[in-house]
Amino acid sequence: MALLPDKEKLLRNFLRCANWEEKYLYIIELGQRLPELRDEDRSPQNSIQGCQSQVWIVMRQNAQGIIELQGDSDAAIVKGLIAVVFILYDQMTPQDIVNFDVRPWFEKMALTQHLTPSRSQGLEAMIRAIRAKAAALS
């Protein structure tokens, strides 16, 4: 995830945006930085239910026990939200992910207040799916 900022820089960059149009553009830019997802990873078992857009999230545990996340969506803003979630969960073990509450970060960014209800529900579905997969690994 070298192309993505860390949590603190994400928050700083987000708060520097002058308005919500700039913030949406920044979210879309983050999504464009995600590595390309392989075709074989766009499978039903990696599909996230509860999102209006098509969303795939792949979770693998490396030799050090750290979770590595990959994902994609057919919608630019949703792909950016995937990147935001991946930044928040970067370098975590399965147990870290289960214990980590992303909501304070979303509140600092005022993120959920400016998403449509369907995007907010999709974001919650992504987080639930990642936490459930992490719980199964921990």
Curated annotation (Swiss-Prot):
One of its GO terms (molecular function) is sulfur carrier activity. Disulfide bonds: none annotated. InterPro entries: Cysteine_desulfuration_SufE, Fe-S_metab-assoc_dom. Gene3D superfamilies: 3.90.1010.10. The active site is at 51 (cysteine persulfide intermediate). Induction: Suf operon is under both the Fe-dependent Fur repressor and the oxidative stress dependent OxyR activator. One of its GO terms (cellular component) is sulfurtransferase complex. GO terms for biological process: iron-sulfur cluster assembly; metallo-sulfur cluster assembly; response to oxidative stress; sulfur compound metabolic process. Keywords: Cytoplasm. It comes from the Bacteria. It is found in: Cytoplasm. Pathway: Cofactor biosynthesis; iron-sulfur cluster biosynthesis. Pfam families: SufE. Homodimer. Interacts with SufS. NCBIfam families: PRK09296.1. Belongs to the SufE family. Participates in cysteine desulfuration mediated by SufS. Cysteine desulfuration mobilizes sulfur from L-cysteine to yield L-alanine and constitutes an essential step in sulfur metabolism for biosynthesis of a variety of sulfur-containing biomolecules. Functions as a sulfur acceptor for SufS, by mediating the direct transfer of the sulfur atom from the S-sulfanylcysteine of SufS, an intermediate product of cysteine desulfuration process. Together with the SufBCD complex, it thereby enhances up to 50-fold, the cysteine desulfurase activity of SufS. This is Cysteine desulfuration protein SufE. It comes from Escherichia coli (strain K12).
